[in-house]
């Protein structure tokens, strides 16, 4: 059966594009695929007409076999029992459509997904293990194997990223960067890591990916530049073949000397650092400061409309503003002693128990070096003379939520 290392998948969707039976789907959050239920496919067991069968297929020269699902559309009465029982919910019936093969989503063990994966994270159980990425992420900003596509550059909200030339390596100004993680979410090759996290990717849709064959001169610049080897040279007619789906990094388009490639990509919204856990709604906030006053760890700072900064109760000449620890994790990466860490805790959101991150601090390990203070993108952290010397990190106690009279704070 097919196995996927979801942890290191870059969510490019090439596997989905090449699968002949739509047995794998890629989203920013997950990779859903037919694993033939570990060798005992429930769809085969429940099919009342015998339209679905499990067969062994020889998959290598050594004679090793793997199970595959075979579908006979002539026997299928489209009852939908297989769809209902499918654990990953990958099986689908194209109801109401005239198709020779009405059922999609079963694995035929063609291994096209294995062959096309640009980072090798798709394998076959007992035959080929999925690749694993071994990285020692250092610092709150970490760049590894950047291909220089520049896709992240225009997406940075504070213009902290520069790229001298296409195909080079990006640079991120640490003084400007706010550790929001938009670059990491955008990077099609997982080359950027912010605050020590493996990013959740943004949704992405290729609107147009076309080749002007009349303009193409067959130089193969795009073939050589493609980090995933997605582009196939067609030497017989001095052109190339573009893939149906790829990472859409745009290197081929940018490096083509005759502008023969036209790529148009639409990115979904980036995930803000505070989209999960404690979330602030700016439209509802009246900058009263009740949340900052009740926070036991000074993890919220408000400048009121009267010019009072709370919880410091200091008069300032500033516009009304709100800042809080978003549990981005930059401080935990910067800490050389391991005194700060991001830990999961159970929270109830919309009636369901979910895992959410909180910052955990061990004062016994802290040497008060101040590295965390410098790393904090929102300038929330500060050292004090108290027994617990560090303040400003969110422990997700939720006391601020009921304190807000406008309902501007919530748990998501």
From Swiss-Prot:
InterPro entries: 3Fe4S_ferredoxin, 4Fe4S_Fe-S-bd, 4Fe4S_Fe_S_CS, Fe-S_Ferredoxin
Residues given in the record as [4Fe-4S] cluster binding sites: 9, 12, 15, 19, 76, 79, 82, 86, 107, 110, 113, 117, 146, 149, 152, 156, 177, 180, 183, 187, 216, 219, 222, 226, 246, 249, 252, 256, 325, 328, 331, 335, 366, 369, 372, 376, 394, 397, 400, 404
Domain 4Fe-4S ferredoxin-type: 2-29, 30-57, 67-96, 97-127, 138-166, 168-197, 207-236, 238-266, 276-305, 314-345, 357-386, 385-412
Cofactor: record remark: Binds 10 [4Fe-4S] clusters.
CDD domains (alphabetical): MtMvhB_like (cd10549)
GO MF annotations, alphabetized: 4 iron, 4 sulfur cluster binding; electron transfer activity; iron ion binding; oxidoreductase activity
Keywords: 4Fe-4S, Electron transport, Iron, Iron-sulfur, Metal-binding, Repeat, Transport
Span of the signal peptide: none
Record flagged with keyword Iron: yes
PANTHER family attached to this UniProt entry: ADENYLYLSULFATE REDUCTASE, BETA SUBUNIT (PTHR43687), FERREDOXIN III (PTHR43687:SF1)
The protein, known as: Polyferredoxin protein MvhB
